[in-house]
Amino acid sequence: MELQTTVHIAPSARQITYQDHILLLGSCFSDSMGEKMDCCYLPHTSNPYGTLYNPLSIAQAIETQSEEPWIVRDKGLYHSLLRHGSFSNTDETRVREAVAASREQMAQALAKATVVIITFGTAWVYEYEQRVVANCHKLPSSAFTRRRLTVSEIVAAWKPILARYKDKHFIFTVSPIRHVKDGLHENQVSKAILLEAVEELTRKDPPCPSRTPSDSPYRGGEEKNLPSSIDTNSSPSLCREGRGVSYFPAYEIVLDELRDYRFYAEDMVHPSAQAVQYVWERFVSTYMSPQTLQDMQTLHRFYQKKHHRILHPDSEESKRFLQQLAEEEKKLKTMFNL
């Protein structure tokens, strides 16, 4: 008897290694995945422009490397309408400098990226002077026009990007975080549009081969009571993949497989740390090569040791530990080019 709906995912033919560089763009769910990559030193760049939610703003971040900052002033603060609120400041010069620095960071990350992970958050957009903004920065609502993107708009914005960057593997996801401020029904319609757009972007690609997924190196410990993955050979898989684009079903995993409020944070909207960990495990078992799994285990253990709280730094034992840690770090930097 099965007491849960399992999302079956076939392992990707495009395996990620430590020779790759990953660029993550999109909603705060992509930030959560970036934090997981930090813990195993997987080469990546996460959201140089800050958190972006709608598909057009994410596409614009890739396409327009020479755009103007588009700065507005409100209540003593300067804001860039193409950036997250973390770029806002009382000093306009600092805002412009931060925007320019993020543009350079984006250009460098895009140039060296071999894998690009895109997380769509919402199909709702706000327009200021007939242009889609990335963030409203709590400006008066009367200054904006709110509307919902269509599937064709999203596809039209992304097809040229996929065609231009054929040397990179794009992984699309839809954020499982519900935008309840839009209304629950409106959120569902929004997510449906995002899912259909991703379906259209991956439709012409052949399905990925069915193989037994590798076990995640992160199972056990606090996560041992989470639902387990099931062999993908027994059921249809949600993985859609061609040489340059694939879809990872983070949305379906959280809403269907983890369909319980114990997997949500206190706000009942964001996934809990346990849910994020589980989705990360599923991502790892889908996209990481066997060698990468071993390397991740090695580097994750080092990360834990490096962030271990030392109670008595002046003790001989602590000094030996720090000396061994420094030697191990030097060795790993050489091995993995960290």
Can you annotate each of these PLM segments?
Residues 266-267, 277, 282-338:
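Conserved catalytic region of serine esterases and O-acyltransferases that act on ester linkages
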Residues 209-212, 220-221, 239-243:
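Glycine-biased, low-complexity coil/linker segments
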Residues 98-116, 158-164, 201:
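Short amphipathic alpha-helices and their capping/turn segments at secondary-structure boundaries
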Residues 118-140, 169-171:
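A short mid-domain helix/strand-loop element embedded in enzyme catalytic domains
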Residues 88-100, 134-158, 178-186:
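Surface-exposed cleft-lining segments at the edges of enzyme active sites
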